[in-house]
């Protein structure tokens, strides 16, 4: 007997939504303004928080408020072929950060790198992190933005993950919603990359008047559900005024309420 697919409202009601505070540029001193557990169950923190005197207190509060916590952009691998001493320094520094986060009770973090980073250079930087990832049980996310100019890029990224042979290395999918082709399905755009996603950033330019609609997010909810996704969906609005994120956060809660209404969809998407 064929298993019935869950509807989008059912998926949305069971998903972890929140705000990507680090990716949105929210100053560390304003983080507490977005500790809104009555609306959200997930959050992304800026790596700069780790360097502040208030870090232990804030992180304890975050872990008390949210079920799904990650720290963004903890390190940037070298863009080109790095010398051995630089690789060792990167591995040691990043390994220490991973250990510290794990001891604090946070088990997910992301790296940051540009599109200019060569795959082989990235692999050489990532492989020395395997012992720290194994020891701590941390999940390390690599950002991948959609849409991308080359349709073969998702397949190449999958190959990079496989070549790394690091099971804790997964994907953070950055969806630039206004740029997504309206007639292309998630499968068309991402292919089997969807199987490796552990977190989704929903990106839009608030200063340009952009704001996502439920018709943009619903297909991705359904597609990732089919791939067993149980990660977080984080709003990451961009603005010249980083404090605008609070306004966007409350608008996002209204969108989530729409997605969770039975009228949002009466049957599963066929993607």
PLM features per residue range, with description:
Residues 43-44, 74, 109-111, 140, ...:
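Hydrophobic residues within beta-strands of alpha/beta enzymes
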Residues 32-54, 75-78:
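N-terminal substrate-binding region of glycoside hydrolase catalytic domains
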Residues 54-58, 83-98, 120-123:
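Glycine-rich anion/phosphate-binding loops
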Residues 20-24, 46-50, 74-79, 114-116, ...:
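Active-site beta-loop-alpha junctions enriched in small/polar residues
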Residues 58-77, 125-137, 162-166:
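Alpha-helix-loop-beta-strand connector modules within alpha/beta enzyme cores
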Residues 1-21, 25-41, 91, 95-100, ...:
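Histidine-acidic metal/acid-base catalytic patches
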Residues 42-66, 113-117:
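Glycine-rich, proline-tolerant flexible connector loops at the mouths of alpha/beta enzymes
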Residues 102-118, 136-146:
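Active-site groove signature of glycoside hydrolases
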């Amino acid at each position: 007997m064929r298993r019935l697919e869950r509807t989008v409202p059912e998926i949305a009601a069971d998903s972890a939504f929140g705000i990507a505070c680090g990716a949105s540029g929210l100053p560390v001193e304003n983080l507490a303004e977005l500790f809104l557990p009555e609306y959200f169950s997930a959050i992304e923190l800026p790596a700069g928080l780790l360097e502040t005197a208030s870090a232990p207190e804030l992180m304890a509060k975050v872990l008390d408020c949210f079920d799904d916590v990650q720290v963004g952009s903890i390190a940037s691998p070298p863009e080109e072929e790095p010398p051995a001493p630089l690789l060792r320094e990167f591995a040691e520094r990043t390994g220490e950060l991973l250990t510290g986060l794990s001891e604090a009770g946070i088990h997910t973090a992301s790296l940051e790198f540009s599109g200019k980073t060569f795959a082989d250079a990235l692999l050489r930087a990532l492989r020395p992190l395997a012992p720290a990832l194994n020891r701590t049980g941390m999940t390390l996310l690599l950002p991948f933005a959609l849409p991308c100019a080359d349709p073969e890029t998702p397949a190449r990224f999958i190959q990079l993950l496989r070549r790394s042979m690091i099971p804790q290395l997964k994907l953070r999918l950055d969806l630039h919603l206004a740029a997504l082709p309206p007639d292309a399905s998630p499968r068309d755009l991402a292919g089997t990359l969807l199987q490796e996603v552990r977190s989704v950033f929903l990106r839009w330019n608030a200063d340009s008047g952009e704001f996502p609609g439920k018709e943009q997010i619903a297909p991705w909810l359904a597609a990732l559900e089919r791939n067993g996704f149980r990660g977080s969906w984080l709003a990451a609005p961009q603005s010249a005024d980083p404090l605008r994120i609070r306004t966007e956060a409350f608008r996002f809660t209204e969108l989530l309420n729409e997605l969770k209404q039975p009228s949002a969809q009466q049957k599963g998407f066929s993607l």
